[in-house]
UniProtKB/Swiss-Prot annotation:
Functional summary from the UniProt entry: Plays a key role in the control of the eukaryotic cell cycle. Component of the kinase complex that phosphorylates the repetitive C-terminus of RNA polymerase II.
Phosphothreonine PTM sites in chain numbering: 11, 158
Protein name according to UniProt: Cell division control protein 2 homolog 1
Tissue expression summary: Found in most organs including root, young leaf, stem, vegetative meristem and flower bud.
Active-site feature positions: 124 (proton acceptor)
The organism of origin for this protein: Medicago sativa
One Pfam family per UniProt: Pkinase
Length: 291
């Protein structure tokens, strides 16, 4: 690429904006910093990433190419300059439109259902990696599948703490056997944040995050979540909070929206709605593609 410009720092390394000399289109170039700098790029990571090139869906940021040169890995993505976090911060009036919230949620779920059908998890969904195409007003998920290829660091390479606000309770409780429901949880948190215009449970440590979740949804026990007490980080000394009615927590949602949110924010991952079923939920029966 020509005239490369640094535009940000992602979870895994520096992100540049560049122009593809051949096609003349603008691309985003992610330089992946690997923990084991000396050994170069693990072949498992290369395999995982190569599979992601096959993933093509209108609500997923397309991975166009993978360049592996001198112990470094560069991922070439389509370029989008706006993410949902910036969008919520800069144009609050836009997100006040319930049709727009519904539209974005629908697109998120379509993208996730597609990934899950290909057995790919995201694991780190947050407003910062939901990108918006201003021309079509469509939302696309970025960084799908990278967590599996590279792991999720506790801190980014610039030592920023990776956010816990969208992390599912089973991960926070130390479960090693989590699956696709973790992404549905994250989307539920983002749904509530779009409706409330502020994060649902902004914890600043794993225990603070768990307790913020429990204060809203109630502390789980063997009745509400069979198996929870045997998760590695569950403590019988956790305070026992009752659950709140979500209508008081997210007052701006229509009843069908609350019903969907309730089924996404189910503490027990086995009872959580799937992305595929969520797309079919009655909340979306009047979906209008907002121009």
């Amino acid at each position: 690429g020509e005239n490369v410009e640094k535009i940000g720092e992602g979870t895994y390394g520096v992100v540049y904006k560049a122009r593809d000399r051949v096609t003349n289109e603008t691309i985003a170039l992610k330089k992946i910093r690997l923990e084991q700098e000396d050994e170069g790029v693990p072949s498992t990571a290369i395999r995982e990433i190569s599979l992601l090139k096959e993933m093509q869906h209108r609500n997923i940021v397309r991975l166009q190419d993978v360049v592996h040169s001198d112990k470094r890995l560069y991922l070439v993505f389509e370029y989008l300059d706006l993410d949902l976090k910036k969008h919520m911060d800069s144009s609050p009036e836009f997100i006040k439109d319930p049709r727009q919230v519904k539209m974005f949620l629908y697109q998120m779920l379509c993208g996730i259902a597609y990934c899950h059908s290909h057995r790919v998890l995201h694991r780190d969904l947050k407003p910062q990696n939901l990108l918006i195409d201003r021309r079509t007003n469509s939302l696309k998920l970025a960084d799908f599948g990278l967590a599996r290829a590279f792991g999720i660091p506790v801190r980014t390479f610039t030592h920023e703490v990776v956010t816990l606000w969208y992390r599912a309770p089973e991960i926070l409780l130390g479960s090693r056997h989590y699956s696709t429901p973790v992404d549905v949880w994250s989307v539920g948190c983002i749904f509530a944040e779009m409706a409330n215009r502020r994060p649902l449970s902004p914890g600043d440590s794993e225990i603070d995050e768990l307790f913020k979740i429990f204060r809203i949804l109630g502390t789980p026990n063997e009745d509400t979540w069979p198996g929870v007490t045997s998760l590695p980080d569950f403590k019988s000394t956790f305070p026992r909070w009752p659950s709140k009615d979500l209508a008081t927590v997210v007052p701006n949602l229509e009843p069908a929206g609350l019903d969907l949110l309730n089924s996404m924010l189910c503490l027990d991952p086995t009872k959580r709605i799937t992305a595929r079923s969520a797309v079919e939920h009655e909340y979306f029966k009047d979906i209008k593609f907002v121009p």
